[in-house]
C-alpha cells in the first residue's frame, strides 16, 4: 500500500512539473505569436486586451487526440442525436420564431427543416453551445505542434474579427476546437459567411437572427440546392 501511495504521489509530482514547464513554454509562445499578430494587422491594444488572459488548456489537447465522432458509424451517430423529444423541441422552436425563420428561408432559399435539423444536431437547438474559452482553445491548439498551422490561421482570423469589432470577444465561449454559436462556426466560417441579419452593428451567432441567416448563407454559398 505504501508503495502504491509513493508511486501515485511521484506521478502527481512529475505531472505538476511537466504542466509548469508547458505553461512557461506557452507564455513564450504567446510572445512570439504577438509578433505574428501585429504583422497581420492586429493592433497591440487589441492583442493585449484579448490574449493576456489566454491559458494553456491541457484538456483541449486530450480532446484533440481523441474525438468520439470519428469512432462512430453513421447509424450510431444519428441515433444518438435524434429522438421524438428533439423533434418536438424543433417544432416548438419553429412556432416561436415563425416570422423570422420564414423570412430567412425566403431570402436564402434554404429549407427551414434543414436549418433546424442542423441546429438540433450541432447544439441541441442552442441549449449547449460549449463553455470553453475559444481564444484559449485556439491558442492551445496553435501552440501544439500537431495542427499548429491550421489553428494559427483560425486564431488570426478571430483576432481580426475582434479588431474590426465584428464580434464581441466577451461572448467567445464554445467548443474545445474553437467553434462558436448555435451552428458551431469556426472563425474562418464566421469571416466568410456570418451575417449581421438584425443590423445592430455586430455579429452574434448566439442570437436567432444572425445565427439562422449565417447558417443559411453558408449553405447557399457552398452550393446547397433546395428540393
Regions picked out by a protein language model, each given a short descriptive name:
Residues 6, 10, 27, 110, ...:
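Generic hydrophobic-segment detector
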Residues 37:
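Intrinsically disordered, low-complexity polar regions and short flexible loop motifs
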Residues 2-20:
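Classical Sec-dependent N-terminal signal peptides that target proteins to the secretory pathway
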Residues 19-30:
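Cleaved targeting-peptide boundary
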Residues 41-227:
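Catalytic glycan-binding domains that act on GlcNAc-containing polysaccharides
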Amino acid at each position: 500500500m505504501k508503495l502504491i501511495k509513493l508511486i501515485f504521489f511521484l506521478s502527481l509530482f512529475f505531472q505538476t512539473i511537466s504542466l509548469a514547464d508547458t505553461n512557461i513554454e506557452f507564455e513564450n509562445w504567446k510572445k512570439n505569436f504577438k509578433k505574428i499578430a501585429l504583422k497581420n494587422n492586429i493592433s497591440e491594444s487589441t492583442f493585449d486586451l484579448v490574449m493576456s488572459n489566454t491559458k494553456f488548456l491541457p484538456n483541449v489537447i486530450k480532446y484533440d487526440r481523441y474525438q468520439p465522432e470519428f469512432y462512430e458509424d453513421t447509424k450510431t451517430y444519428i441515433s444518438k442525436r435524434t429522438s421524438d423529444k428533439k423533434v418536438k423541441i424543433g417544432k416548438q422552436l419553429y412556432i416561436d420564431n415563425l416570422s423570422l425563420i420564414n423570412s430567412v428561408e425566403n431570402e436564402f432559399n434554404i429549407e427551414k427543416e434543414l436549418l433546424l435539423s442542423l441546429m438540433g444536431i450541432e447544439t441541441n437547438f442552442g441549449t449547449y453551445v460549449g463553455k470553453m474559452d475559444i481564444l484559449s482553445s485556439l491558442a492551445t491548439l496553435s501552440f501544439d505542434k500537431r495542427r499548429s498551422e491550421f489553428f494559427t490561421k483560425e486564431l488570426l482570423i478571430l483576432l481580426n474579427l475582434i479588431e474590426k469589432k465584428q464580434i464581441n470577444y466577451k461572448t467567445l465561449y464554445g467548443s474545445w476546437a474553437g467553434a462558436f454559436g448555435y451552428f458551431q462556426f469556426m472563425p474562418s466560417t464566421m469571416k466568410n459567411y456570418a451575417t449581421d441579419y438584425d443590423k445592430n452593428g455586430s455579429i452574434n451567432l448566439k442570437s436567432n437572427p444572425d445565427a439562422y441567416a449565417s447558417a443559411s448563407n453558408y449553405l447557399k454559398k457552398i452550393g446547397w440546392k433546395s428540393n
